[in-house]
Amino acid sequence: MHISFSALPTKIKQLLALCALTIALPAQAQFRVEVTGVGLTQMPIAVATFRGEAQALQKIGAIVKADLERSGVFRSVDTAGAVLDESTRPDLAVWKQKSADSLVTGSVTPLADGRFDVRFRLWDTVRGQDLGGQNYAVTAGDLRLSAHRIADFVYEKLTGEKGIFSTRIAYVTKAGQRHTLWVADADGENAQSALASPEPIISPAWSPSGSQLAYVSFESRKPVIYSHDVASGKRKLIANFRGSNSAPAWSNDGRQIVATLSREGGSQLYVMDAGGGEPRRLTQSSSIDTEPAFSADGKTIFFVSDRGGAPQIYRMSAAGGNAERVTFNGNYNISPALSPDGKYMAYISRVGGAFKLQLMDLAGGTSAQITDTSADESPSFAPNSRLIVYATQQQGREALMTTTLDGKIKARLAGASGDIREPDWGPFSR
């Protein structure tokens, strides 16, 4: 590929040059959510402090509030520390006067077996209606998950669309010679190490069921593709053919994996059973074809190729065949990610000397830049298609960010220090 490798973002250096990672692990795998920006049509909502939450290890109300703010759909109304449980009907007129269209109340109660009873209720202050609620009996370790589920309930009730707060993200890091694959909540908290290795780990990709993660490991001194069972920690070898094995992408039904293999010389796209087996070649070019991504209907594969002289995004039938160029603005476009609703493609474009996150309307073919940072990488859509997670540099630090599709609301999932790379947003699964 005719590119200056010194100018490439980290992910493409890994995929095309198959070099060692050069990023640093955060001092700790905990994140702080920082939300910036204001949307034009945000819904004002008040989330009260849950009665009894001081007895728990998590502030349920604060987590629900942060989730809703990060979505870009809601604007929080100050509750002035009000503590309200779900069992008593609040004075909704007071909250309407505070400009809150909705109100969330709840409680957290310790149980005799060590678990916690978490209850909540959602109120419509404008119509004076009880919009319902739920209750969960959870362990201390699942208190955050219960808060995310509350936020999911609120989001779906008020927007008519499924919430994504109880979903998960995966990403990779490096500290010294230690490379780690992490799985975390959608807000970046509760990070758990899925795999650690002295050799690089790259390209994590969630299966459609959310039970598996495909990734590329260099532990055998060459890039090899594995599938990792998230619940059990067991893994299965998927592709270890001659040459490199990289950039795995799951088919929409989870039965197949498309990847870039160089078993016949050049780097081309191949499809194989998700459990491994003999691959079938999909592309027949003399160029580098990499970074495959399936369309929402599973009928089309988008990928990056330099067959036109510079890296651009193409698409072809999932069965293979002739490829059609998709990106035309600029001479460097990589990392396609398709929205689950089939409407958009996120990708990275080189603009001058910067790498910018772009969003393309697939129906019209028009693109818009939606970030103001200069080293964006690895976009991935939330399963409801309303947010994008990506890696970038901000204020001299590597970080994960989420953004709304219009770029107006961004949330930084920032560690204390160091680098975080290659996020992939998991499906609705829990």
Go through each PLM region and give its residues:
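Short beta-strand->alpha-helix linker/helix-N-cap micro-motif
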Residues: 35-94, 104, 108-109
